[in-house]
């Protein structure tokens, strides 16, 4: 029977079929293949896998005939991938064998991770609750994308997870984007990133603003911005100069790391580029320079010299 994983109360129950679970298990074995080949003692698992009818007598003889332990373990992993119950039976065998118990935790964590990814994909593609199944959560139109976890009671984005919850803009409890830290009302980690908090309770913005970099949160009561709004990827502007300036953020200004726009104060900006687009700044007073002085320019590349050698 297929296992059911309800993502959130009130949402439709998204179900993984047996074929989905088999795909996840094969993906787990493939991802952990290098580690399993190095640590799996194949001779300890042949009897259990034969008893569970995962391997036939000929399969066990073929595994035993391999010259090295790594080749035997690799063939055993391949055979478990080809059987719908191979992953679970191999995990049971590792749990029962002395010296192989540490592999059980790795297999279970990989299974949970890829099950969550598969569930999120199916939940998004289902199109329920206004979600648009034709647009992934990194596209420009994310109006229907909501977070998997409950939203923060203070407003803004959810405390953990990713997604859009409130319209972008100067708001007392953050802007677009699900929080990536429990204390964050702002920053996002959807595909392509999102906007951090802007207002009195803005958290630390991380990631990109859909098409480009990110937008840092603004103090007071919010952490420094972890992403930089720039049009050339990566990025990290720090927090802007706060108005009014709180005691715990003295001389707080721009700065940060990454390509694109450089904010010249309060941090060590890198790779300064084009100035920010005026249409993207909701309040010009927030883009003022701080009082920490200009950031240093990136170092020049080393000079190349040509050396001549005589024979």
UniProtKB/Swiss-Prot annotation:
Record protein name field: CARD domain-containing protein E10
GO CC term, one of those recorded: host cell plasma membrane
InterPro entries cross-referenced by the UniProt entry: BCL10/E10 (IPR033238), CARD (IPR001315), DEATH-like_dom_sf (IPR011029)
CARD domain mapped to chain residues: 21-110
Gly residues: bias regions: 252-272
Molecular function terms from GO: kinase activator activity; NF-kappaB binding; protein kinase B binding; transcription coactivator activity
Entry function: Activates host NF-kappa-B and JNK pathways. Induces hyperphosphorylation and redistribution of host bcl-10 from the cytoplasm to the plasma membrane. The inhibitory effect of cellular bcl-10 on NF-kappa-B pathway is then overcome allowing NF-kappa-B activation.
Region ranges (Disordered): 125-181, 203-230, 243-311
GO process annotations (BP): positive regulation of extrinsic apoptotic signaling pathway; symbiont-mediated activation of host NF-kappaB cascade
Polar residues bias spans: 140-152
Compartments in which it is found: Host cell membrane
Protein keywords: Activation of host NF-kappa-B by virus, Host cell membrane, Host membrane, Host-virus interaction, Membrane
Gene name, Swiss-Prot/TrEMBL: E10
Top-level taxon in the UniProt lineage: Viruses
Transmembrane segments: none
């Amino acid at each position: 029977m297929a296992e059911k994983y309800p993502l959130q109360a009130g949402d439709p129950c998204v179900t993984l079929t047996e074929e989905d679970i088999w795909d996840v298990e094969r993906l787990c074995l493939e991802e952990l293949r290098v580690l399993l080949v190095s640590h799996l003692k194949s001779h300890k698992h042949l009897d259990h896998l034969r008893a569970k009818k995962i391997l036939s007598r000929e399969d066990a003889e073929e595994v035993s005939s391999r010259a090295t332990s790594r080749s035997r373990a690799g063939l055993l992993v391949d055979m478990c991938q080809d059987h719908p119950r191979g992953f679970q039976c191999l995990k049971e065998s590792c749990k029962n064998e002395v010296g192989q118990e540490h592999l059980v935790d790795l297999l279970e964590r990989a299974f949970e991770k890829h099950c969550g990814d598969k569930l999120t994909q199916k939940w998004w593609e289902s199109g329920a609750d206004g979600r648009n199944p034709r647009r992934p959560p990194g596209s420009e139109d994310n109006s229907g994308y909501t977070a998997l976890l409950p939203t923060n009671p203070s407003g803004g984005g959810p405390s953990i997870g990713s997604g859009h919850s409130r319209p972008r803009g100067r708001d007392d409890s953050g802007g677009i984007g699900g929080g990536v830290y429990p204390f964050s009302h702002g920053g996002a980690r959807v595909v392509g990133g999102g906007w951090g908090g802007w207002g009195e309770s803005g958290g630390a913005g991380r990631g990109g603003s859909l098409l480009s970099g990110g937008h840092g949160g603004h103090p007071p009561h919010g952490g420094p911005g972890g992403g930089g709004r720039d049009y050339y990827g990566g990025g990290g502007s720090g927090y802007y100069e706060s108005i009014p300036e709180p005691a715990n953020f003295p001389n707080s200004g721009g700065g940060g790391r990454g390509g694109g726009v450089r904010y010249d104060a309060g941090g060590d900006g890198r790779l300064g580029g084009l100035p920010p687009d005026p249409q993207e700044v909701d309040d010009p007073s927030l883009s003022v320079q701080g009082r920490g002085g200009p950031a240093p320019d990136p170092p020049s590349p080393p000079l190349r010299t040509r050396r001549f050698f005589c024979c």
